[in-house]
Amino acid sequence: MNRKSFLVSILAAGCFVATSLLMPSTGNAQADPRVAKSMASLKAAAAKLGAGKLDGKEAVGGKDAPALYFGAAKINNNFDVVDAVSKEDGKGMTATFFVKSGDEYIRVSTSVPKPDGSGRAIGTVLAGPALESIKAGKAHYGEVPILGNPYMTGYEPMKDGSGAVIGIYYVGYKK
């Protein structure tokens, strides 16, 4: 191998490593551009309100859950942020804030509808491949079944000021 080929190989390997480190951890697919854009919007809207924290409890969808706050804004049963992110996309994007409760993650604010269309799917618990990624402290991007329907999704761990995972940011659209 000549010097030029060697340098090109090293450069290509370096680009691959850098890309791998900078991209979010994913499930079976790379982040869909729509999902990535909406995830950035959801996280920015939350950050604009203030740091995330858990304080007290509040029932959501008939299930007791830790109360999630961004700054002074309580997120449980408050749909302003998720609705704004969903409307920003304008093409069926959904958004959710999950809160960690023991080993479960409970939807406390969402634009995801119940399967029967009778309201929002708050109080439901995350299950499936995204849960395993989050438990490992990693993001999950790809197709995931949500309440029986296929969605192209993104899930990212939500951390408090100490770095502890307190919930999950979710965005996705029905395929």
Where are these regions (language model features)?
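Bacterial N-terminal signal peptides that target proteins for export
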Residues: 1-12
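C-terminal segment of classical bacterial N-terminal signal peptides
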Residues: 16-26
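N-terminal leader/targeting segments
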Residues: 27-33, 138
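Extracellular/periplasmic ligand-binding regions of membrane signal-transduction receptors
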Residues: 31-75, 112-118
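Short N-terminal helix-loop-first-beta-strand/juxtamembrane motif that initiates sensory/input modules
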Residues: 36-55, 83-105, 141-143
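Conserved beta-strands of PAS-like sensory domains
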Residues: 69-74, 150-175
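Extracytoplasmic/periplasmic sensor domains and loops in membrane signaling proteins
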Residues: 76-90, 108-148
